[in-house]
């Protein structure tokens, strides 16, 4: 079993490890994001972003143009830089539609797509001072040479050129969430909006993003693999470090050293009754001996995310009550995955999961009436997954699944401590979540390598050999260093 655990956490592909020997003395042009020349350990020739070739980006733009009504244009703005304080920015993450269509990972740009002009990109202009403080950015040359824009202009030209394009268009599509005042303040845009000519672009782009290409699926499998390895490694160390904050930090570390650029979202690490809070994110409490911990996490790899949840007892043993409730969630997870196939809808899967969970909760005496079920689980069984965690949100859950869709299956029960049920069940939250690819014949569980069977989890936790550092608990570290044990042990790490 120790061999199995080692094998599970060591399955790291070449894309998950940055080679320390890949370097060149040749001068490489910096465009503010990785290129095959600057990052040969990440990218092959012909790729605009790791794993995605220029031909795929051009194909995406062609498909979007085909969806646009005649004489229409689409305006796609890069994501804005969001500030933590007046001079400290939050880590930048690109708008998914802008990245999907251009491959540009940087802020400050606006892309315009139409049948007549093709892709027109308005790019940020940097001064020597900007470059000294923040480095190079992709400009007009990169737009033409790297992103293969049909036309490229500095952003200062946008008011003049885009106004003319809007005046001669019957409809204008854009995304409200990422809209930039660079164009929304233009008189011609506002006139079109007042005439009802401005439409939401996400209704079109989210359709395109639903079905993943082979290249996208390769990245999603890799992202899921990293998440599984990171979560398993964290689970194995939770016995020595039963602390929400430490486990949150560790899972991010484990994912990033395997190649992930960031977490897909702030991890949910809920110990004990905190697990009954669906999107709990404080992650600031010690986990009591005998309590369960629910960890909902995912990572992002080159623009594609994973989303994975497991619930386990850091002490290494499920209690009989925990096991009874966990088994209900596990069986619901497995039965719903079996129903994943072309033609099924997420709404149908949700109805099926509700029936299974209601039946089980009624038998256990937790529910006195089916009408109370949504107090214990107000969520859907799952959602679409891709470049965003809740991907293609403009597409409803009545859409029949097709090969190439990726969805989550995440049944759960969240019982508040105040809920009117047998006391032994109060304050327990359990969720088991997997990422599922819809195939021609059924499904593929992308997160299938992450253990979820009770006996498997218990055996892994109890047979895992900690190294000397992991064998020492935070409290004992306090004692060794002569510190008071009522101090926050995380200050030591």
UniProtKB/Swiss-Prot annotation:
Cofactors required: Mn(2+)
Pfam families: AMP_N, Peptidase_M24
Keywords assigned by UniProt, alphabetized: Aminopeptidase, Hydrolase, Manganese, Metal-binding, Metalloprotease, Mitochondrion, Nucleus, Protease, Transit peptide
Any Gene Ontology biological process: proteolysis
Phenotype upon loss of function: No visible phenotype. Altered mitochondrial protein stability.
Transit peptide: 1-19
EC numbers for this chain: 3.4.11.-
Name listed for the protein in its UniProt record: Intermediate cleaving peptidase 55, mitochondrial
Gene Ontology CC: one annotated term: mitochondrion
Organism of this sequence: Arabidopsis thaliana
Family annotation (InterPro entries): Aminopep_P_N, Creatin/AminoP/Spt16_N, Creatinase/aminopeptidase-like, Pept_M24, Pept_M24_MAP, X-Pro_dipept-like
Molecular function via GO: aminopeptidase activity; manganese ion binding; metalloaminopeptidase activity; peptidase activity
Chain's role: Aminopeptidase which cleaves preprotein intermediates that carry destabilizing N-ter amino acid residues after the mitochondrial processing peptidase (MPP) cleavage site and is thus critical for stabilization of the mitochondrial proteome.
């Amino acid at each position: 079993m120790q061999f199995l655990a080692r094998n599970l956490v060591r399955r790291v592909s070449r894309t998950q490890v940055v080679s320390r020997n890949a370097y060149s003395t040749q001068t490489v042009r910096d465009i503010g994001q990785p290129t095959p020349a600057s990052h040969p350990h990440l990218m092959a020739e012909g790729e605009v972003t790791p794993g995605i070739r220029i031909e795929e980006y051009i194909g995406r733009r062609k498909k979007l143009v085909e969806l646009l009504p005649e004489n229409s244009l689409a305006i796609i703005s890069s994501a804005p830089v969001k500030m933590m304080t007046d001079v400290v920015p939050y880590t930048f993450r690109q708008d998914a539609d802008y990245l999907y269509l251009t491959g540009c990972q940087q802020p400050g740009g606006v892309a315009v797509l139409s049948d007549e002009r093709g892709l027109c990109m308005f790019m940020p202009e940097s001064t020597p001072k900007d470059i000294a403080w923040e480095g190079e950015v992709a400009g007009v040359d990169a737009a033409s040479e790297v992103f293969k824009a049909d036309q490229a202009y500095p952003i200062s030209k946008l008011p003049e050129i885009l106004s003319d394009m809007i005046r001669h268009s019957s409809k204008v599509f854009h995304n409200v969430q990422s809209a930039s005042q660079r164009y929304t303040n233009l008189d011609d845009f506002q006139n079109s909006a007042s005439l009802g000519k401005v439409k939401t672009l996400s209704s079109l782009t989210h359709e395109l993003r639903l079905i993943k290409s082979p290249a996208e699926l390769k990245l999603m499998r890799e992202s899921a693999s990293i998440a599984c390895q990171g979560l398993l490694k964290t689970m194995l160390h939770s016995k020595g470090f039963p602390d929400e904050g430490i486990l949150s930090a560790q899972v991010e570390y484990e994912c990033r050293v395997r190649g992930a650029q960031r977490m897909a979202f702030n991890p949910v690490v809920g110990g004990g009754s905190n697990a009954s809070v669906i999107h709990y994110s404080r992650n600031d409490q010690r986990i009591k001996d005998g309590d369960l911990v629910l960890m909902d996490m995912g990572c992002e790899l080159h623009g594609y995310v994973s989303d994975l949840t497991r619930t386990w007892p850091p002490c290494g043993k499920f209690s009989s009550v925990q096991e009874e409730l966990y088994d209900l969630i596990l069986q619901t997870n497995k039965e719903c995955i079996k129903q994943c196939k072309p033609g099924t809808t997420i709404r149908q899967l949700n109805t099926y999961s509700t029936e299974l969970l209601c039946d089980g909760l009624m038998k256990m005496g937790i529910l006195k009436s089916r009408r109370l079920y949504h107090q214990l689980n107000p969520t859907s069984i799952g959602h679409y997954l891709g470049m965003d965690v809740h991907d293609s949100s403009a597409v409803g859950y009545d859409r029949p699944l097709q090969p190439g869709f990726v969805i989550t299956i995440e049944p759960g029960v969240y019982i508040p401590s105040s809920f009117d049920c047998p006391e032994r069940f109060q304050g327990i939250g359990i969720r088991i979540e997997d990422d599922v690819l819809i195939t021609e014949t059924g499904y593929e569980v992308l997160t299938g390598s992450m253990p979820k069977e009770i006996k498997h989890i218990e055996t892994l936790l109890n047979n895992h050999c900690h190294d000397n550092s992991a064998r020492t608990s935070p409290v004992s570290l306090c004692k060794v260093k002569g510190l008071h044990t009522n101090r926050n042990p995380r200050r030591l790490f």
